[in-house]
Amino acid sequence: MPFEIVFEGAKEFAQLIDTASKLIDEAAFKVTEDGISMRAMDPSRVVLIDLNLPSSIFSKYEVVEPETIGVNMDHLKKILKRGKAKDTLILKKGEENFLEITIQGTATRTFRVPLIDVEEMEVDLPELPFTAKVVVLGEVLKDAVKDASLVSDSIKFIARENEFIMKAEGETQEVEIKLTLEDEGLLDIEVQEETKSAYGVSYLSDMVKGLGKADEVTIKFGNEMPMQMEYYIRDEGRLTFLLAPRVEE
């Protein structure tokens, strides 16, 4: 048995895969003794996704030898969404080219998914000269993106000293969400200079899909630069997105 991995709380794991599946059709997951990782770009090459789940967040983690498995994200998502919050998720791979997915709750359900050939992405997360860093609650970011979607297909992020603004402007409507450190929704802000950049609402909508209300989200960006959005899974796991900017005319 090349690996057997157990995660308590099937629904939480499903939300991670659901978020990624909205941006990519297939993925190559690296399974090593240290944990599970995946890096991929969406077909339009606008968003880079980087997932890192260390072995410590799993209740059981046994890997005989490092392996890379390719999966269809839509198929994986549909199966994992059958799990509930208190269900146990078990991932196994034997010698055959299948991933065995078991969901244990009021009953034990086992699915076998064929693995596929997926080209591994050998791309490093670039070190960018960000000039602004903000930490917000997941609920606030999700609401802001939803508000922006009502009036425009892009949203502008503006960071000033002690102030973070998310703003969208349509032909006849506009919306502005302003946060200061006095607001519960803004947890931290570091600004080297006033920073502005716009991003596509549709991509952000997919990126924030898996956020919980109390999740802390770290956003880093620069003037008309890519935005890095990151949040943690059980303190040690991490999901990171790098989103290309919308260059304004």
From Swiss-Prot:
PROSITE patterns (alphabetical): PCNA_1
Superkingdom classification of source: Archaea
Record keyword DNA-binding present: yes
Key words of the record: DNA replication, DNA-binding
InterPro entries: DNA_clamp_sf, Pr_cel_nuc_antig, Pr_cel_nuc_antig_C, Pr_cel_nuc_antig_CS, Pr_cel_nuc_antig_N
PANTHER family membership: PROLIFERATING CELL NUCLEAR ANTIGEN (PTHR11352:SF0)
Entry protein name: DNA polymerase sliding clamp
Annotated organism of origin: Pyrococcus furiosus (strain ATCC 43587 / DSM 3638 / JCM 8422 / Vc1)
Gene: pcn
